[in-house]
Amino acid sequence: MQTNELLDKIFRGARSQNGWLPTPVPDSKLRELYDLMKFGPTSVNCSPARLVFVRTEEGREKLRPALAPGNVEKTMAAPVVAIVGYDTRFYEQLPDLFPHNPAVKAWFEGDEKVDFANTTAFRNGTLQGGYLIAAARALGLDCGPMSGFNNQAIDQAFFAGTSIRSNFICGLGHGDPEKVFARSPRLSFEQACQLA
């Protein structure tokens, strides 16, 4: 694939989906997706993202009560819904993830460092969520990211008793081109950027 084709596939031609074709996404594709996105950089390789790939009827029914009314139909129709979460105790994995500096775990441990740890987890987990979308599109999947849901309800249903918190959800599969909205405008370089 040529560079421009790939950029179109991931960015210029890709669209947030509002409807889905009934084409299944195999578990092997979800593994391939994670095994690609995990290579995106994070601060001190902290890798705080934690994912739940909701793909069964039982999982969907756990998810349904947390969704905003306007998001129920399209979310329930997605072959897979990724819950993109972040682990606020990500630093427990740092001895394995950042082995050349064993002291780095201590940067985040302790009551006085909770805010720093939580901010780091949220920021880098969000970054990894962006990698998930880019990787999914590169692998030929469409995405429907959204934040129209009750985080506390998701956390209770899927992460109770853990240090993981939900950030956003993202439908994955093959989108229905008939249900894609017209592309909304984007800010120009001059509106969004400065050269310093």
Curated annotation (Swiss-Prot):
Pfam families xref list: Nitroreductase (PF00881)
Segments passing through the bilayer: none
Enzyme class name: oxidoreductase
Superkingdom field: Bacteria
UniProt keyword annotation of Cell wall biogenesis/degradation present: no
Key word Flavoprotein present: yes
Cited SUPFAM superfamilies: FMN-dependent nitroreductase-like (SSF55469)
Keywords recorded for this protein, A-Z: Flavoprotein, FMN, NAD, NADP, Oxidoreductase
Any GO MF annotation of the entry: oxidoreductase activity
EC number: 1.-.-.-
Cofactor(s) named in the record: FMN
Similarity comment: family membership: Belongs to the nitroreductase family. HadB/RutE subfamily.
Name of this protein: Putative NADH dehydrogenase/NAD(P)H nitroreductase Reut_A1586
Originating species: Cupriavidus pinatubonensis (strain JMP 134 / LMG 1197) (Cupriavidus necator (strain JMP 134))
Lineage of source species: Bacteria, Pseudomonadati, Pseudomonadota, Betaproteobacteria, Burkholderiales
